[in-house]
Amino acid sequence: MFILNTKKNFFAIIINVKIGEKIMKKLAILGSAKSCVLEDILKYFNGKDVEITCLSDDEHCEFFKKAKELNENTKLLPYEINVEYFSSHDVDLVAVCDYRKVLQKEVFETNKFINIHGSLLPAFRGADEISRAFMAGVKVSGVTVHKLTEDIERDEIIAQYPILIENLTHFDEFEENIYKLEGMLYPIVIDKVLKDEVFDFSDFLTSGGCGGSFGGCEGCH
C-alpha cells in the first residue's frame, strides 16, 4: 500500500504485486542421432520450472525414440522448416545434442543455440572427434560446451572440462568417460544459460560433477 498524506489531500493507493511468481523457462533439445546426453538433461531438470520440448528430424533415431519412451513432449521437425519453427516459437534456449546436419544460417537469428562437443575445442573440430583425438595420441582431451553461430569456425566457448588419457587407457573406456562427462556438464551449463548466469567450475564441482573417475581429475584443479 502506498499512502500520500498532505494537509489538503489524503490518498491511499493499493497496489497488488505478485511476489515470488516464477516464470517458466522454455528449453528445446534438438537431436537426430544418439541419446547419450538426453536422459541426463531430463533427469537434471525434473521438477524444475523449465518446459522442455524434444525436437528431431528423424523419428527413427535413438534420440527421438528415447524422448518418447520417457514421455517427454516431442515433435518431429523436418530440417526444411527449422527457420519457420524457431521464428514462430518462443524458446529461451536450444540445446543441440548430436544433431547431424548443419543448421541454416537464418536459424541463428531466431534463438540462442548451444552445443556440446566431445573434444577440447578448437582441437578436433567436426565429426568423429572422440576417435580422432584418441587415434592422434593426445594425452589430454575433454568436453566443450559452446555457442552455435552461423560461423562454424568460430567457437564461443562457454565451458570446458579435461580428461587425461593414460598409456593403458582403451578407446572404449575413453569414449565412455567422454559421454559420462557430457552428461554431467551439459545440464549444469544449460541451467546457467537459462538463468543468464555465468558458468563457474565451482558449480560443477559442488554438484558432484567430478568424482575423480576420469583419470587424473585431481590434477586438473
Question: What is the role of each PLM region?
Answer:
Residues 2-221:
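One-carbon transfer enzymes
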